[in-house]
């Protein structure tokens, strides 16, 4: 019900918001409650992208040039689209060949910087990223995907697929195929806040949830 404000390292913006007069019960003091669907949010990610409704992260994270879906759960230490040096393209992998102005060597090489902007990461909805996971540039994480703690994801992850390891490999699926298909048809992440409140306890059992709300 609450989108949680956080303060993170490079790639995130601090939410310096006052605490409301009446907090929801059991909300930890270190988190600032912000209503979902709050409209004029500041960007969550370096590059101007915004987090989807109800998406949250904890602790220190670096998220760059990424489009985050709704209801994403991002643990501490996650890095999405980290810097990739041109180690195989250039005679030197160091910044000085493209961030030239930092070293008094002339103008920056905007072509390489533009390439990084284009190599975006896209996450679907209800995606869970475990502690210290890394998602490399150009990767798409499907709806419901789960990335294990410490994984390094270098390829796309299918909807509701579970991956882990270095590099990340297929571990399993959250649900059997028929439930995955039903979840994609239901698209509960598009429900209104009032609908979520009314149907909250239906989420307790995935199979029963699909039987009740699958439009087919």
Sequence positions of predicted segments:
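Leloir-type glycosyltransferase catalytic cores
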Residues: 114, 119, 187, 192-201, ...
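Conserved G/P- and acidic residue-centered "switch" motifs that form tight phosphate/ATP-binding loops
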Residues: 147, 165
